[in-house]
């Protein structure tokens, strides 16, 4: 058993320190370290690493608290949300953890490091620091009680349940495991599924003028989760005319024409399928559109289907030709 210790605060726990402790124990140096939960100053000072407690941030001394006055650390100069203990540990050790898990080179490690922060860790930083996702004067249409931070919160003892340290510490171990498995699941997804998709989308972007002279239609060599990559690659490559449609073969061997949203999380489309097509199917849709082999056009105009690649491409081209050139460009 290692003599190294990781100290975090006692009492109620949160998602950020649960993940911070788990991340540290992924590292060979700390994998056998003992987790101590205390607010006692002498215990904190004797610990090898202090996380989310102690009112000190000092990487050289392995002190990673963010609650103290004057703390302003962010992930980098492109991010303005202050780090939580999870963000601090990830900032310093995230690349090592990614390389250790996936055996990636430096450029891929950097790409995954940024992606995982933006898609997961930053949320923990925002929640723990009380940063709203949207202006407070906007009333939510429904309650959200199932986020990962909320699920960790639910592991705390209820007000009318025993607050015995042994019980609470056992619950904290569950919180660490919950956060750790969530982190590893996301890391594996981005490394093994999300990342390989990037080259497929990038290849379609490079060939877009061969697909259609407008450069506004992509055809994927195979289906993959393309949306995230499309928006980031458009920005990276400074593409002036936004992509309007992405075509791909579905699992039945038919083809889909998918309209692109104005951003990754919006249901508003850069260019929907024509209104007169929407909600129509099969021969009726083929008659209205003048395109053979039509299968369907969704009632909201965000996706359509055709039996052939050529038919799906014609659906995209006809939509482009019917649209005002100024639309969302």
Swiss-Prot record:
Q: Pfam families this protein is in?
A: MYG1_exonuc
What's a single GO CC term here? cytoplasm
Cited InterPro entries: MYG1_exonuclease
PANTHER family cross-referenced by the UniProt entry: METAL DEPENDENT HYDROLASE - RELATED, MYG1 EXONUCLEASE
Family, similarity comment: Belongs to the MYG1 family.
Annotated protein name in UniProt: MYG1 protein
Q: Which organism is it from?
A: Dictyostelium discoideum (Social amoeba)
Source lineage: Eukaryota, Amoebozoa, Evosea, Eumycetozoa, Dictyostelia
């Amino acid at each position: 058993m290692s003599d190294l210790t990781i100290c975090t605060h006692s009492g109620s726990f949160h998602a950020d320190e649960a993940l911070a402790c788990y991340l540290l124990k992924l590292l060979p140096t700390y994998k056998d370290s003992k987790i101590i939960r205390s607010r006692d100053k002498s215990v904190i000072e004797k610990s090898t690493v202090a996380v989310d407690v102690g009112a000190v941030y000092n990487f050289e001394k392995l002190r990673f608290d963010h609650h103290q006055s004057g703390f302003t650390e962010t992930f980098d100069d492109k991010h303005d949300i202050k780090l939580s203990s999870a963000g601090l540990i990830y900032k310093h050790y995230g690349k090592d953890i990614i390389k250790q898990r996936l055996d990636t080179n430096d450029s891929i490690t950097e790409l995954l490091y940024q992606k995982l922060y933006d898609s997961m860790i930053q949320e923990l930083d925002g929640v723990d620091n009380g940063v709203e996702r949207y202006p407070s004067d906007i009333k939510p249409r429904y309650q959200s009680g199932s986020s990962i931070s909320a699920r960790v919160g639910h592991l705390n003892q209820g007000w009318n349940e025993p607050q015995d340290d042994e019980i609470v510490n056992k619950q904290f171990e569950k919180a660490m495991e919950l956060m750790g498995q969530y982190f590893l699941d996301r890391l594996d997804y981005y490394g093994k599924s999300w990342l390989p998709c990037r080259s497929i989308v990038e290849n379609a972007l490079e060939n877009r003028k061969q697909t259609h002279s407008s450069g506004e239609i992509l055809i994927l060599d195979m289906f993959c989760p393309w949306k995230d990559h499309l928006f980031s690659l458009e920005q990276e490559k400074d593409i002036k005319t936004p992509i309007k449609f992405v075509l791909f073969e579905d699992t039945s061997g038919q083809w889909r024409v998918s309209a692109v949203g104005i951003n990754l999380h919006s249901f508003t489309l850069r260019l929907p399928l024509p209104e007169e097509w929407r909600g129509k199917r099969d021969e009726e849709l083929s008659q209205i559109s003048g395109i053979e082999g039509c299968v369907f056009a969704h009632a909201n105009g965000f996706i359509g289907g055709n039996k052939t690649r050529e038919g799906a491409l014609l659906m995209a081209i006809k939509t482009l030709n019917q649209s005002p050139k100024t639309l969302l460009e």
